[in-house]
UniProtKB/Swiss-Prot annotation:
Disulphides: none
Species name: Paenarthrobacter aurescens (strain TC1)
Pfam families for the chain: UPF0102
Family membership: Belongs to the UPF0102 family.
InterPro entries: Restrct_endonuc-II-like, tRNA_endonuc-like_dom_sf, UPF0102_YraN-like
Protein's name in the database: UPF0102 protein AAur_2443
Domain of life according to the entry: Bacteria
Length: 121
């Protein structure tokens, strides 16, 4: 039996909330938790004619800073490279791509708070 750590459970829950949120914004989710040797993409979606790679950051509180603060230039560069790898693996020519970040704050008591930054890179 595999037991997930609380941090991992929170992250999975946040990713599910983010996927639902993005679908409600009109996006079509085409992949989740895609992995390759260079890293992982949380969510891949289509928004009109644009391929969207969404990074999801989930926290219980703001005690250690806003989730957006965890996405630095190195992470954005990695996501850009990963988006190219995803397109190669899926034999998809996606001239229009963007990277979005979704912040989820879920303390388990009140309704989770989601924020969405479009086109951060």
């Amino acid at each position: 039996m595999v037991v997930m750590r609380a941090k991992d459970l929170l992250g999975r829950s946040g990713e599910a909330l983010a996927a639902d949120f993005l679908e409600n914004q009109g996006m079509r989710i085409v992949d989740r938790n895609w992995r390759c040797p260079d890293g992982e993409i949380d969510i891949v979606a289509i928004d009109g004619d644009t391929l969207v790679v969404a990074e999801v950051k989930t926290r219980k509180s703001l005690d250690y800073g806003h989730p957006f603060e965890a996405v630095d230039a190195a992470k954005l560069a990695r996501l850009h490279r990963l988006s190219s790898s995803w397109c190669r693996q899926h034999q998809l020519n996606a001239p229009r791509r963007r990277i979005d970040v979704v912040s989820v704050i879920d303390n388990g008591v009140v309704e989770p708070q989601l924020e969405h930054l479009r086109g951060v890179c």
